[in-house]
Structures are given as structure tokens and as C-alpha cells.
Amino acid sequence: MRVSDARPLMGVAWTITVYAGDRHAGDAAIAAGFAEARRLEQVLSDYDADSELSRLSAAAPTPQPVPVGDDLWRLLVRAEEIRGLTDGAFDITVGPLTTLWRQSRRSGKLPRPDKLAAARAAVGGDALRLDPKLRGVSLRRPGMRLDPGGIGMGYAADRVLAVLAALGIDSAMVDASGDVVVSAPPPGTAGWRIAVAGLPGDDAPDAKTLVLSQAAVTTSGDARQAVDIDGRRYSHIVDPRTGIGVSGPAAVTVIAADGATADALATAASVLGPDAAADVIDGVPGCSARFVWQAGDGIEHCTTAGWPAD
């Protein structure tokens, strides 16, 4: 029996859909899934000053490694792995820059050079150190702020799917406002049908509905979150290496084996652009991507080698 419910969590709409033996079992599983998402919000939120992540950021710089819980540790380990894969195009220490650009989007003015320099000084891979023996985290620079926005939603969706599986739900979809993870297909189908997001006017044959199982998919880009300042468009996604908001408009959809990977690689791909991002994505087993961007009055698009065929 198909059972589905939607609730606001982590500042966005979440939908959990399961196939269960009966409605009671489905409702119970979904309730457990939402409870897990709420628990993770208390760990990973960078808006809640009392979350574990926010308390860690507030302690920067930390003279000694700070022990953290399992979820924050796993998130940071994967974030550092993706940072290495992308040569810093994804960097969870980008928080000071995203905060600064959030203010710029509200004011309609570019960040002041001195403030941009100060924020950049608090960002970078060598600013974060992980101690596997202690499961401890060192934040080595003043003013650091961890930003889980490019990986946290995907990670949380993964953990919710794991909770559903532990309750005997073999076929489920968790949709965290576009960060989608799925397990086995619905009964009698080849997979879960998931629409690919893009840009207005994107009607190419590969802008379609995906059919996925045991996979995750995320779309990232500035199609809906951007600001025009001094005649130039800036995304909400900031390049951690330069401190500047990505210019667009563009969108990238990434398919991966898990939500955290899809989420982080989609963010990195928005920074890198199609060519450099394709080199990274082609090297990750189970990953593929579709890129779409505005080119004059038209829409251009391309896909990596592993993107599902029409």
C-alpha cells in the first residue's frame, strides 16, 4: 500500500512516500522518518544557535579537537572527501562567505572588499582538521562558520531512508525539497519517477522524468535563488576559492549512490562548470550529471557519459 505525507522541516518541505503492508505500518514508518529528520536538524542546522554544528562553529578557533557525535562526524568526513575530489570547489568551511553574500542579496550591493577579505581568511581546507582517533574536530581560524547547506539535506535524507529500511520498508522515497533519495522500486515498476529540474524553456529530450532505484538525485543552481547587482547575476552558491557568488543562470542535476554525494557534487558542479565538473563526476562510481545554462536568448545543455539514455 502506498502511503505518503509531507511536513516542513529544516526550512523546506519534506515528503516521505513508502510502500507498506497497510496504512498503519506506513504511517508509523513515515512518522519515524520525520522524527529522524527533526533529530538531525538539531545536529546539523546552521540557523539554530543550539545545534551541535552551530555550537562547534561558535567555538572557533578551537585550541584542541572538539569531540562530536556520529552524525556530525560522518557529515564532516564526507564533506572533506568531496572537498578533495573537487579541489576545493565544495568546502564546508564556506560559511563566512555565504553569510556575507546573503547580506548582499538582501541589500542589493556587493560585499565590501575588506569584509570579503576577512571572510575569505576564515575559509579553506586547511582551516578544518579532523582527528579520527578522537572523532574530534579542530577549527583553526577565528571567525570560522561551517555551512552544511551543500551536503546536509542530502545526508539527512540518507539517514531517514536508513530508518525506513530498518523498519522493514523496502520501497521508499524521501524528497527533501529536491534532494531525493530512493530505495527499491514501487511494486511492479522499474523505479521511482523523478522529474528533472532545469531552467525555463529547457525542453531538450534529456530534460525528462528519471526512473531510479537505490539512488539519489539533486539539482543545484541559481534558477530561483540569485540576485542582480550592478548588471550582473550572482547565485546563492559561492565559490569557496574566490569568495564570489557563481554567475549564471545555470542548473546541474547529479545522480549518485547516496544523497550526501549527490548534494555536494551538485554544489561543486555549479562552481566548476560543465567541463571541469564532468571530469570529477566521471571519476565517481554511480555518478552522472546533466548541465543546463542560459546562452544568449537560448538554452544550452550537456550530460556526462553515464546520464540515463532517452
Model-found features: residue ranges?
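Mature catalytic core of soluble alpha/beta enzymes
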Residues: 1-310
